[in-house]
């Protein structure tokens, strides 16, 4: 049986934490679709096209990543449209788990064939979040340990351009 899964997120920017989950998921599933949310409530630094391109560059070496797309819909609706019945979710803390278990129940109610698989973040990256990285970068802190080089360069360029305007 071909196992296809969706890994959704905002990826603003993609971090080593995201890459940890994606890399490990490619060892479990035959095909991974990375779905990048166009969630304006999060006020992303990068636009959707930039986040898709950064994610593509960072995951090029992962052959099981078959598709990277943006979406502006309920996740369950996207999964149904993409004919995927597995959602991959990374969990760092008990607070993440509490949120994710509620989200999984709602998604299951909307799309009964959809199951959520939770992968615990590796301990080396379990504290990384895009929000923390952006905060560190805004105050000129070192963000290299948290981001793949493409995302690191892009974030520094973006912050420098924004401060010039």
Swiss-Prot record:
Catalytic activity, as annotated: (R)-4'-phosphopantetheine + ATP + H(+) = 3'-dephospho-CoA + diphosphate
Residues bound to ATP: 10-11, 18, 90-92, 100, 125-131
Keywords of the record: ATP-binding, Coenzyme A biosynthesis, Cytoplasm, Magnesium, Nucleotide-binding, Nucleotidyltransferase, Transferase
Domain of life: Bacteria
Site (Transition state stabilizer): 18
Reported cofactor(s): Mg(2+)
Enzyme category, top tier: transferase
GO terms for cellular component: cytoplasm
GO biological process: coenzyme A biosynthetic process
Subcellular location: Cytoplasm
Residue stretches spanning the membrane: none
Assigned EC number: 2.7.7.3
Residues that bind substrate: 10, 42, 75, 89
CDD domains on file: PPAT
NCBIfam families for the chain: coaD_prev_kdtB, cyt_tran_rel
Family from the record: Belongs to the bacterial CoaD family.
Quaternary structure, from the entry: Homohexamer.
Function field: Reversibly transfers an adenylyl group from ATP to 4'-phosphopantetheine, yielding dephospho-CoA (dPCoA) and pyrophosphate.
Name used for this protein in its record: Phosphopantetheine adenylyltransferase
Biological source species: Buchnera aphidicola subsp. Acyrthosiphon pisum (strain APS) (Acyrthosiphon pisum symbiotic bacterium)
Gene: coaD
